[in-house]
């Protein structure tokens, strides 16, 4: 569930909470762990993309072999050695057997017909009453109805992922705007270089072109070094390069670091005394003269004028982290691997001290795999490898965090105490924003995320004060949504800004809007946006020369995204992209906001172009990606049509999208698969172009697929979102059930064949919906990596929406999947989970299975993927999990699970054996 990340239609996403929604899946181009959106090979960035860019490599795991599926009954006959016709021995006996078989088959067929005709579970009649929904838009594919069906392997393999170019914007040494960091592939041109955005193809000479690394390899003491990640210094004279990367958690990694001199094209270890020491994090000073880094959980500093490395801390260890987050802060708070911040003048370093001594450990067992370099002790080869994770579950002790400071010139560490009434065990440091003059803006929340406090700390004076305090519980009963987009605005009297300030997203009249606080100590802001719509991860960019703020918002529709600009005084709000069409845009701005990478992401074929901002007098407009191959595919294959509408439940308008199969015929009866995620603040119904598992189900299997974003999801206002506070699962499930009831009234829907499925939070919602519905509307469900008890999930995420279990015992009981009697009313359901899931622990599924065992239930199937984490990838498991979903769903809608509800032994085999024996 991690913190804020752009998420859309997400299957294997981790639980995520707010902002733009959930994390990536096989179709999402957002921020996540398991995206199959393709990044063009020629555009892989040499540095980590900035917060306003999205780009994720395909997570395919090689090729897959089509497996043969055998009918078990057919195989058993072969084992009996029965020959259906002919054969020399015992022809008379064979004829007797033949006629007995005929009689038995006819009788069996007749009996089966009577049973099926009288069974309510097999009546496929539906009500002809109309739905309560209102249809608003249909997105039809370009493909002919007789086009090819989309194979599942093509979807999982990334064939349908749009090519997305990620751009690493970089400022020039003199503040030049519109520069890109580029890495050449295939040995063509210099390996690492800076180009002007107007010369992105390198076709003409440009004064802003700078070669940083001529070759893709360099040598240190005869050792051949091939950099995997690079970070140029702000003055572009040195490159920090990393090799031998080892992945840690979702965002964190370690590696060996090197300093590469641009002028001499030579390199040296970051720490000459420990060249093989694995570094967890490293970052440049704004003045380019030093690098601060964390190794073995301690912080060090290396000044470029010396080869000496100086320790800033020395007591870091297994339970004490400096400058990097622990697991829960990485996953749920920062969404990244850094907890170190330089002051803008480079004179001070602030860093987080994280103490997780009191945090309980959770074991993750690996039965088949081992960490790189790990060798079991002799005699222990047959035992699982157990990884212990400090994982604070809901109500358990959290890590305690404190913000520390280091004076670079004086070489001394210190802390600044600010009394804001948050105790150490009730504090989450959510965001740190460097400001001018050695100042830092610090956003803190209480543990249950309903109190937010903003503090200004002056490192030079070693003092600080609280400048803002809000109690969201008193505003709307909701929660504070984590932010990573707060933007500092320096003072500039010549530009009309006499004081410094910052832009933040706040709650205004029930919606998330942009506010400008100036001076920074002012608790009352100037509103930059207002209305019944919301800003998204805003601001995207700020033009300080012209006092213009750029942002993405849902002003036209909750399921649309458009790019807007507004003046710092709140005037001249305008849309920058095509205002006449419903669409989904994203944007990435250059550091000075003079240029932008505009990304059209749907509903039609995505494209990208580089353009100058409206405030930039130097006009520029160039398309860099049209996804022609994707357009070609969409003309060859039959894609479903998308029908967008809203349905009103309890006075709330819920966005819905229905995928109809090619050659849809309203006179036929179609089974329906509901797909959902449903996590707080997430969004699954939107106008992005996606070809995913849902597309495959509609296109290849010919089923209807419906997705509804119920209450609790994002971008429909705080009232819509925060109603789920303290009671996760209830309203969300209610909305799925009511929507399914309305869909069951449609003349083309077979209401006796309705299923629901989801992954992660969607897995929880699948089970909660089945539990609440008790077989009345949904007959089938498929839950992947589900939460079944919120006491098992991490504290930061869970308590944000549920409070601590100690303060909401009844809510936790209600939110757990515990009513086995209700689940027994469904025809059948499927649960799948990875045994090494470090996010939603396998404990969730095992606990539910125990409850089902106690009740003697048997209307479910379980598939466990050994050593797979939350994404379920190990040993081609990602292919398997989707193939199992597909096969299981086909069997469900073919009535196979109805047949298995009351299995009876077949006497046919015994009769034949006896006849063969005595004949």
From Swiss-Prot:
Sequence ranges of Polar residues compositional bias: 44-55
GO biological process terms held by the UniProt record: proteolysis
Transmembrane segments: 96-116
Pfam families: DPPIV_N, Peptidase_S9
Subcellular location(s) per record: Vacuole membrane
EC number: 3.4.14.5
Cytoplasmic side: 1-95
Gene Ontology MF terms in the entry: aminopeptidase activity; dipeptidyl-peptidase activity; serine-type peptidase activity
Annotated region (Disordered), positions in chain: 1-89, 121-150
Domain of life of the source: Eukaryota
Residue spans of biased composition, Low complexity class: 27-38, 127-136
Main location group: membrane
Record: active site: 760, 837, 870
Enzyme class: hydrolase
Reaction(s) catalysed by this chain's protein: Release of an N-terminal dipeptide, Xaa-Yaa-|-Zaa-, from a polypeptide, preferentially when Yaa is Pro, provided Zaa is neither Pro nor hydroxyproline
Glycan attachment points: 207, 303, 355, 577, 665, 814, 819
Keywords annotated in UniProt: Aminopeptidase, Glycoprotein, Hydrolase, Membrane, Protease, Serine protease, Signal-anchor, Transmembrane, Transmembrane helix, Vacuole
Membrane topology: Single-pass type II membrane protein
Side Vacuolar, residues: 117-919
GO cellular component: fungal-type vacuole membrane; plasma membrane
Family: Belongs to the peptidase S9B family.
The protein's role, per its UniProt record: Type IV dipeptidyl-peptidase which removes N-terminal dipeptides sequentially from polypeptides having unsubstituted N-termini provided that the penultimate residue is proline.
The protein's name: Probable dipeptidyl-aminopeptidase B
